[in-house]
């Protein structure tokens, strides 16, 4: 008689960041008081979580470990992350799972649209993992999701936060043709930190991507953001502002980098609220229509309220010019 031993049932769970497993722990300084947030416990948070789970959706709020999830979900605000939960890049700052993703779910656009409808969102933010494995980087899936939301929720304004579509010819044009209200693509950090923080991306490609959106459709608002506390110098942050204004970007967000795990890039320092206030004032003087800069600022935080302010700022600028 032969006894078969089942080794599959005890298979270890695949690590979330296998490419970082061999790295020594990176120790960050303790968080200051101004970084602390309350744990999410409200009924509104639970209701939003239930709608997300019932529709089998992924949110960047959960995957990236956003500190604002309790506040946003309590208000029924969620940022949907399409095309799966696994990214083909391995950025040093990001908590999203890395590896080879599954195929696209053709029903996902409809599921996202249904969740938007159930939540009664006036403004929705759609982001995605990087999908370097796809010929178009997922551009058609973005467009399909926008179209599905337009059909089921015609009054909902749509903001997208996209990957860089590096070496994906024609992908950007497909997404812009779907006419999102806001096109966001984050630079994430200053150029000198790209090799250690965002090695799979190219700084000036990202700047050019944002500039190209405006060239294709000047009516679309453009937006970008960076994290600070990664070892950048103040003058480098100001240069990023100038680069984004040269690309006619409307909205800038600046927030504090927070280390997801000890295997991720360390926090080099915590930027004070007063320094964030200074960055915000300078950015407005450089011509941005909208600026949000604070320790807990994230791309999608208060996105609906900020979109209303962004529209008002453009209208005021046009009236003053006329």
From Swiss-Prot:
One of its GO terms (cellular component) is cytoplasm. It is found in: Cytoplasm. Residues 8-25 have a biased composition (Basic and acidic residues). PROSITE patterns: RADICAL_SAM. InterPro entries: Aldolase_TIM, Elp3/MiaA/NifB-like_rSAM, Lipoyl_synth, rSAM. Keywords: 4Fe-4S, Cytoplasm, Iron, Iron-sulfur, Metal-binding, S-adenosyl-L-methionine, Transferase. Its EC number is 2.8.1.8. [4Fe-4S] cluster 1 binds at residues 61, 66, 72, 300. It catalyses: [[Fe-S] cluster scaffold protein carrying a second [4Fe-4S](2+) cluster] + N(6)-octanoyl-L-lysyl-[protein] + 2 oxidized [2Fe-2S]-[ferredoxin] + 2 S-adenosyl-L-methionine + 4 H(+) = [[Fe-S] cluster scaffold protein] + N(6)-[(R)-dihydrolipoyl]-L-lysyl-[protein] + 4 Fe(3+) + 2 hydrogen sulfide + 2 5'-deoxyadenosine + 2 L-methionine + 2 reduced [2Fe-2S]-[ferredoxin]. Coiled coil: none annotated. Residues 73-289 form the Radical SAM core domain. Residues 1-31 are annotated as: Disordered. [4Fe-4S] cluster 2 binds at residues 87, 91, 94. GO terms for molecular function: 4 iron, 4 sulfur cluster binding; lipoate synthase activity; metal ion binding. HAMAP family: Lipoyl_synth. This is Lipoyl synthase. It comes from Afipia carboxidovorans (strain ATCC 49405 / DSM 1227 / KCTC 32145 / OM5) (Oligotropha carboxidovorans).
């Amino acid at each position: 008689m032969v006894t078969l031993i089942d080794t599959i049932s005890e298979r270890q769970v695949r690590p979330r960041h296998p490419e970082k497993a061999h790295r020594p722990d990176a120790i960050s300084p303790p968080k200051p008081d101004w970084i602390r947030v309350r744990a999410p416990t409200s009924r509104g948070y639970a209701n939003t979580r239930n709608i997300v789970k019932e529709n089998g959706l992924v949110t960047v709020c959960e995957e990236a470990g956003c500190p604002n999830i309790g506040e946003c979900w309590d208000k029924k605000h969620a940022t949907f992350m399409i095309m799966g939960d696994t990214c083909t890049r391995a950025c040093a700052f990001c908590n999203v799972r890395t590896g080879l993703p599954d195929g696209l779910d053709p029903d996902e656009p409809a599921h996202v649209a249904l969740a938007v409808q159930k939540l009664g969102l006036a403004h929705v933010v759609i982001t995605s993992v990087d999908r370097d494995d796809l010929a178009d980087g997922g551009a058609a899936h973005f467009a399909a999701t926008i179209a599905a939301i337009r059909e089921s929720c015609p009054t909902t304004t749509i903001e997208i936060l996209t990957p860089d579509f590096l070496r994906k010819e024609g992908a950007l044009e497909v997404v812009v043709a779907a006419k999102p209200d806001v096109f966001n693509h984050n630079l994430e950090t200053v150029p000198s930190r790209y090799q250690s923080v965002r090695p799979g991306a190219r700084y000036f490609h990202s700047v050019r991507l944002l500039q190209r959106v405006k060239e294709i459709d000047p009516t679309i608002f453009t937006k970008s953001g960076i994290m600070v506390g990664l070892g950048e110098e103040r003058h480098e942050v100001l240069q990023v502002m100038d680069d984004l204004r040269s690309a006619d970007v409307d909205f800038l967000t600046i927030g504090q980098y927070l280390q997801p795990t000890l295997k991720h890039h360390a926090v080099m320092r915590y930027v004070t609220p007063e320094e964030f206030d200074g960055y915000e004032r300078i950015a407005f003087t450089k011509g941005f229509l909208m600026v949000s800069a604070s320790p807990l600022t994230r791309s999608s935080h208060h996105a609906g309220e900020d979109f209303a302010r962004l529209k008002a700022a453009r209208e005021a600028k046009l009236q003053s010019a006329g």
